[in-house]
Amino acid sequence: MFEKGSLIPYLTAGDPSVEKTLEFLLAVEEFAGLIELGIPFSDPMADGKTIQESHYRALRNGFKLDDTFRILREFRRHSSTPVILMTYYNPVFRTGVKKFLGEAKASGADGILVVDLPVSHAGEFLDAAKEEGLKTVFLAAPNTPDERLREIDKASTGFVYLISLYGTTGARDRLPETAFEFVRRARKICNNKLAVGFGVSRREQVEELLKAGADGVVVGSALIELISRSENPVEELRRKVAELSGYSRAL
C-alpha cells in the first residue's frame, strides 16, 4: 500500500469543513506514501485530546458520514495517493458492514482500519472487505503477545499498525524505548509492512522508528494541532508534512 520509509499523515474529515479537508489532503498528498483519513465519531476512545477535539469540531458543524465519502470522491479526481479510512465500529455497524465497505470502495478508499474491532470478531468485516477488494489494517499494542500478533498479521492485508505506547494518541516529546523494542519484535513475526503511530510529532522520531524497522510512520495530533491554531493552515501543513517526510530541503 505504501513504499518503505513513507510518512503517513492523519487528518480528520470535516475539521473544520468539507472544503478545507479537501485542501488539506491535496496539500499533503505530494509527501505522503499513504493518507489516513479519520471519520469523526462522538466517542473516539483511542484518541487523545487533540484528535478528540477535531472530531467534536466536525460533528458540531454538522458533518455526516456521507461527507467522508464525498471528500474522498473529490480527492480521487486529483490524486491517486492511497487512502485508508480510520473509523470506529459503530458507524460501520449502523450503516451495515457490506453497505459501508461498498460505499468506501466506490468513493476511492484503498483500505479500512476499524479501531475498536478485534480480529476475533472481524469475520463478517473481513469477508466483506475481501469481496470489495479493500485492504484491512489492524492495530497491535506493545503488550500484544506474539501469537496474537501473528493473528493480526494474518488478518491484515494492507499493513499492521503498531501502537508506539500505552495510552491514547497525542504528540510526545520522546517516544518510550518500548516503541522501538516493539518494532523490532514485530519485524521478526509479521510478514506485512509495519506502520507505527501514536505520539510521533518530529522528523527525528520518524527517522528513529524507520531505523528500528518500521516501513511507515503515522503522524496525526501534531498536524491536527497545527491546523487548529494556524492562520494559514494549508501552507503550514504542507511545510510540516514535507519536513516530516524529509523533503524540506526541496521546498
From Swiss-Prot:
The keyword Zinc does not apply. One of its GO terms (cellular component) is cytosol. Keywords: Amino-acid biosynthesis, Aromatic amino acid biosynthesis, Lyase, Tryptophan biosynthesis. Pfam families: Trp_syntA. It catalyses: (1S,2R)-1-C-(indol-3-yl)glycerol 3-phosphate + L-serine = D-glyceraldehyde 3-phosphate + L-tryptophan + H2O. Pathway: Amino-acid biosynthesis; L-tryptophan biosynthesis; L-tryptophan from chorismate: step 5/5. One of its GO terms (biological process) is L-tryptophan biosynthetic process. The active site is at E36, D47. Its EC number is 4.2.1.20. GO terms for molecular function: tryptophan synthase activity. InterPro entries: Aldolase_TIM, RibuloseP-bd_barrel, Trp_synthase_alpha_AS, Trp_synthase_suA. Signal peptide: none annotated. Belongs to the TrpA family. Tetramer of two alpha and two beta chains. HAMAP family: Trp_synth_alpha (MF_00131). The alpha subunit is responsible for the aldol cleavage of indoleglycerol phosphate to indole and glyceraldehyde 3-phosphate. This is Tryptophan synthase alpha chain. It comes from Thermococcus kodakarensis (strain ATCC BAA-918 / JCM 12380 / KOD1) (Pyrococcus kodakaraensis (strain KOD1)). The lineage of its organism: Archaea, Methanobacteriati, Methanobacteriota, Thermococci, Thermococcales.
